[in-house]
Amino acid sequence: IEVLLGGDDGSLAFIPNDFSVAAGEKIVFKNNAGFPHNVVFDEDEIPSGVDAGKISMNEEDLLNAPGEVYKVNLTEKGSYSFYCSPHQGAGMVGKVTVN
């Protein structure tokens, strides 16, 4: 699945922001706008035993240009919340369910 970071209208959002994948399915987060974005998983809102640091971008790393991507495979079933650290306060958050 491809998830866009930033709407075509300039909105600070993940599109889609709530979706499901199969365990091990590749998720491609793609910068859709000229704003710097990243993808950080919330260590308190992922399945127990999953290391948020291994699935998240470093908070200092940013996808600066349109078309830049971050890819991740989630293998543990459950619910994962994530956010863009520069824009979390603006509501740029999302959730993926791994089945």
UniProtKB/Swiss-Prot annotation:
Record-annotated Plastocyanin-like domain positions: 1-99
Keywords: Chloroplast, Copper, Electron transport, Membrane, Metal-binding, Plastid, Thylakoid, Transport
Signal sequence interval, chain numbering: none
Compartments (UniProt record): Plastid, Chloroplast thylakoid membrane
Species, as recorded: Cucurbita pepo (Vegetable marrow)
Entry-linked PROSITE patterns: COPPER_BLUE
Originating gene: PETE
Keyword Metal-binding: yes
Membrane topology: Peripheral membrane protein
Keyword rRNA processing: no
UniProt function note: Participates in electron transfer between P700 and the cytochrome b6-f complex in photosystem I.
Lineage: Eukaryota, Viridiplantae, Streptophyta, Embryophyta, Tracheophyta
Binding site for Cu cation: H37, C84, H87, M92
Protein name (database record): Plastocyanin
Family, similarity comment: Belongs to the plastocyanin family.
Obligatory cofactor(s): Cu(2+)
GO molecular function, one term: copper ion binding
GO cellular-component term (any): chloroplast thylakoid membrane
